[in-house]
Amino acid sequence: MTIDGRENGAHERFREGLVIPAMPLALSAEREFDPVSQRAILRYYVDAGSGGIAVGVHSTQFAIRELPAFFENVLTFARDIIADWTQRRETRVVMIAGVCGKTRQAISEARLARSLGYDAGLLSLSAYPQASVDELVEHVRTITREIPVIGFYLQTAVGGRRLPYEFWRRFAELENIWGIKVAPFDRYATLDVMRGVADSGRAGELALYTGNDDAIVADLLTKYRPAGRARSSFCARARTRRPVVCRSRRTFSRLARTSPR
């Protein structure tokens, strides 16, 4: 794997639009890791047509980092199961690892994910609730030197923070950025991302995925016209006829590709 993820085609597939479920952590009745159930979940995602799998995010984001080596063990287990099952099924899956914490921790997690063959990191900024835009951008820039980054706009109700238009414009201008998962559950915050990406000049290069569970259909179908620009597409056609196992899929792709009026 190269640091930009182009060698295995993962970057291009991510840009085309995929269904990418967040892997839940399977536990036994004794609250211990259940490898049999975990394997079944991962195989189901592949068989259902998922184009990517995100590991160490969502319901597994925090707890697996509290036990020594458990984060690495979960990432390794998921990688091995997906590699084996996709080979049997003659398909490919983009592997995304969650990356969180302050810069030192995030660097360590990014390096681990890259060493295990993950294609990109979904970067949480929850560890910086009071940081300035300059500080946030520098943090992201540091992580992009380790692994391709997908931004994550998490709703404030579950630990996210408000991220302004200026941050998203500068975020989109950084190198080695693949896209953004937009899940603030807020239309105005979502529009800040749209405007920031459009004004970055890189709208045609980045893929934007919706995690707005309260507005999935609207995100997939709405077209936007940022001020001073031609119409922007907020949606992508479905890439699979199989059951959708996760609602976080590409939207907002190739925003404002044309020049101002």
Stretches found by the model and what they are:
Residues T142-R145, Q155-R261:
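Catalytic alpha/beta core domains of metabolic enzymes, predominantly
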Residues T2-R162:
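Active-site beta->alpha loop and helix N-cap motifs at the rims of alpha/beta catalytic domains
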